[in-house]
């Protein structure tokens, strides 16, 4: 379960920013999550309350925004979304696709006090 390591890293980031920016409490943590990142937000939501006790992240609201997957077709040059169950280019039907986006996982913003 890599979500535990991600949750700890998230809390470490908040603690580091609290020290650097001089805030005492994070109220809201907004994250961007790629459709193909493999991260399960519900696991982070379950782990976060216990893992963040006694830190600047304790009690913060976690918000996730999904970033859709993006692909480039080697056959026709199409760039964009592809139906998951199809796994082929919507323009030419080709299957030589390279993922160019959708694996991301990062903190987009912190609301603090």
Give the predicted meaning of each segment.
Residues 81, 94-98:
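Short functional micro-motifs and their immediate structural scaffolds
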Residues 32-36, 65-69, 110:
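Short loop/turn motifs enriched for small/polar and acidic residues
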Residues 61-68, 78-83:
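Short, flexible, mixed-charge glycine/proline-rich loop motifs
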Residues 71, 87, 105:
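Cys/His-enriched microdomains
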Residues 2, 29, 105-113:
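Long, charge-rich boundary regions
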Residues 73-76, 89-92:
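Short cysteine-rich clusters marking metal-coordination/redox-active sites
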Residues 1-59:
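Long, charged N-terminal interaction/targeting segments
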